Amino acid sequence: MPPSIPVPSIVTRAIPSLARAASTTTKSTPSKEHHVHSYSPEVLPLGYAVASTHASIKKKTGALDLGILVSTTDKPASAAACLTRNVFKAAPVTVTTQLLQSGGGRARGFIVNSGCANAVTGKKGLEDAWEMSNTVTSQLPPGQRGIGTLVMSTGVIGQPLPISSIISKIPELVRSLDDSPKSWLDLSKSFMTTDTFPKLRAKSFRLGERLVRIAGIDKGAGMIAPSMGPPQPPHATLLGVIATDAAISPPALQSALNYAVDRSFNNITVDGDMSTNDSIICLANGAAGKLETQGRETAEGMEEITEDGHPEEYKVFREELRSFAEELAQLVVRDGEGATKFVTIRVKNAPSYETAQAVAKSIANSSLFKTAMYGEDANWGRILCAVGYTPTAQAIIPNHVSVSFIPSANVSDPTPLRLLTNGEPEANIDEDRASVILAEEDLEVEVDLGDGHEEAKVWTCDFSHEYVTINGSYRS
């Protein structure tokens, strides 16, 4: 017999203790109900009618999952869109792209469904999206049928639409169109999938001599890392629609939307996943009247604003659209799946806007950073690591970089907490003060690249235990 071989004893290594003990307590997601807003009729844009219903797309009985918005003006609205750059574009994205191209940047309205993305569904999915569009258009009054209805879908990828159920509900939707605040809020509910609250915003502003109104709806909580561009060439999910009664030409509207989206929706991330369906549609129907000296509105039509012909009004509109889109985009982050924190990443003194944006996104998409924020752990090494592997990192000078936590308005001491200065760590970081700052729901991280004058902001949330739970059972 071969000699017996002694079995070595198992050596247990002690894990060195960290500077801060990890919490094992699971935090509950804070209530988001205070983000739900309703509006008086005076704030909602003129010349639009909306409706929504249950079409048995969602499993929950009675859940709103199909909606439409129609411009009731004689002339179709100017229309612009920023759509996903994911190569697996969903059928509704393709249909919307083609409708905008064939319609010369004009549309009558849109139809949206939630619960099924109609993505990666082949020829049948494309046929279904066209049938949705064509059926809405055919049900409108004869004077409103000359141009197409855009299409948006959100939900599970790879499953077919219950198209018969959807088509059967469209006549009912068209008959129930109205412009009431309740109908607008219900329309926002028809966008929802894993969202915990409907996202509707509206406001008014002066544009030259006219009072202009704007309303927006979006949805999203997971699969959020949009990279959207104009539909030429065609490029859980982010969907959004912005409707205004301003009069602006299709090219000017597309230009303004590109600018606004790149500084709002393209600067948010929940989990770093770009959807097949991301779509932001903007409609402008020109229904706003001219203000008289007494402050009343006349029914006089508006001349469409163009970028070159009305440069000052165009800039005002573009900035109003940008700030409005930013508010809508932030709602998506605040409703991030399982999120307990809303985090602003501000990168300043960068050599270019593109560099600042790339650095901020790199931090915001870092799973290690996001879990540290959930654990309220001032682990600034994870921030610096994400800065260092940014695709544009060659433009960064390490010994120029500084990192700080910026306290929220609720913290008594507003002084920034410096963690790193010109590439050197601070010798005595106040961990107790860091804990106070990180305990707040709203957080801000500031990264100073020290090598320019450009700045970008990106908004993200933390990763919690609940995010895994939600996405581990998404289809059930």
Swiss-Prot record:
Signal peptide range: none
InterPro entries assigned to the protein according to its UniProt record, in alphabetical order: Arg_biosynth_ArgJ, ArgJ-like_dom_sf, ArgJ_beta_C
Annotated substrate binding sites: T193, K219, T237, E337, N471, S476
Top-rank lineage group of the source organism: Eukaryota
UniProt keyword terms in alphabetical order: Acyltransferase, Amino-acid biosynthesis, Arginine biosynthesis, Autocatalytic cleavage, Mitochondrion, Multifunctional enzyme, Transferase
CDD domains attached to this UniProt entry: OAT (cd02152)
Location (main, coarse): mitochondrion
SUPFAM superfamilies in UniProt: DmpA/ArgJ-like (SSF56266)
Complex and partners: Heterodimer of an alpha and a beta chain.
Protein's UniProt name: Arginine biosynthesis bifunctional protein ArgJ, mitochondrial
Lineage of origin: Eukaryota, Fungi, Dikarya, Basidiomycota, Agaricomycotina
